[in-house]
């Protein structure tokens, strides 16, 4: 199975598998929900998620905010050296199930830094998408994810006339592997930001968007639509 660390913007409470009874931001390591926070998801409004981690504090933090100032914060103390392989890929994932929503990514940026004692070098990877083209060569698109419509990344499928569809899942990973940790590193860390628009015709939008870090050959587990957000093979 893939090794996944994720920050979920979970719009649908699957209380049968241990979700809180409201939309929430969650940090997940492997397939365990490590920490959750209540999130007032605003249907049809653009929200911004900012995720950060550094090897000194060993804390994965995320803030999801809206233009009206409403925000939710979740953080989890974790040493990524113990969880992830040294080289990883970063991506965005989303899914719908019985209920649906659009999972539109308007922009996405990422910066990682790895400072090593032995060589005094800093390895940094940085990318920024302020829009997505139809033929976006530096992204690996999986399953239903598409780019280019209105300059956006649509992580799940929408009909040609716009409405979201149910039981769809998609992911976009940056093509270049990221050196996320190294035993001799003095400082390792990253910052990621994405702006997303979740819009649903249903009174229950579902299921959510996640920023994730995985082994470089990660693929979408079969049957991971709905509550599994395209990340996990079973409902832990």
UniProtKB/Swiss-Prot annotation:
Binds one manganese (or another transition metal) ion and one calcium ion. The metal ions are essential for the saccharide-binding and cell-agglutinating activities. Homotetramer. A carbohydrate binds at residues 12, 98-99, 227. It comes from the Eukaryota. It holds the Pfam family Lectin_legB. GO terms for molecular function: D-mannose binding; metal ion binding. This is Concanavalin-Ma. Belongs to the leguminous lectin family. Gene3D superfamilies: 2.60.120.200. Ca(2+) binds at residues 10, 12, 14, 19, 207. Glucose/D-mannose specific lectin. InterPro entries: ConA-like_dom_sf (IPR013320), Lectin_LegA_CS (IPR000985), Lectin_legB_Mn/Ca_BS (IPR019825), Legume_lectin_dom (IPR001220), Leguminous_Lectin (IPR050258). Keywords: Calcium, Lectin, Manganese, Mannose-binding, Metal-binding. Mn(2+) binds at residues 8, 10, 19, 24.
């Amino acid at each position: 199975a893939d090794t996944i660390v994720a920050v979920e913007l979970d719009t649908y409470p699957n209380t049968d598998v241990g979700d809180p009874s409201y939309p929430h931001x969650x940090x997940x390591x492997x397939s365990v929900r490590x920490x959750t926070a209540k999130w007032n998801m605003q249907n049809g409004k653009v929200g911004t998620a900012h995720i950060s981690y550094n090897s000194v504090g060993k804390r994965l933090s995320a803030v999801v905010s809206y233009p009206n100032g409403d925000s939710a914060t979740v953080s989890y103390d974790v040493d990524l050296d113990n969880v992830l392989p040294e080289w990883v890929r970063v991506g965005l994932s989303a899914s719908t199930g019985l209920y649906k929503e659009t999972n539109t990514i308007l922009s996405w940026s990422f910066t990682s830094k790895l400072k090593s004692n032995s060589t005094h070098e800093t390895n940094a990877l940085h990318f920024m998408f302020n829009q997505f083209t139809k033929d976006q060569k530096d992204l690996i698109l999986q399953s239903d994810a598409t780019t280019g419509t209105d300059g956006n990344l649509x992580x799940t499928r929408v009909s040609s006339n716009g409405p979201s569809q149910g039981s769809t899942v998609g992911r976009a990973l940056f093509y270049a592997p990221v050196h996320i940790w190294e035993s001799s590193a003095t400082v390792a860390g990253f910052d990621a930001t994405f702006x997303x628009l979740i819009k649903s015709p249903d009174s229950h939008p579902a299921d959510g968007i996640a920023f994730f870090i995985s082994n470089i050959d990660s693929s979408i587990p079969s049957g991971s639509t709905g509550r599994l957000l395209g990340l996990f093979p079973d409902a832990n």
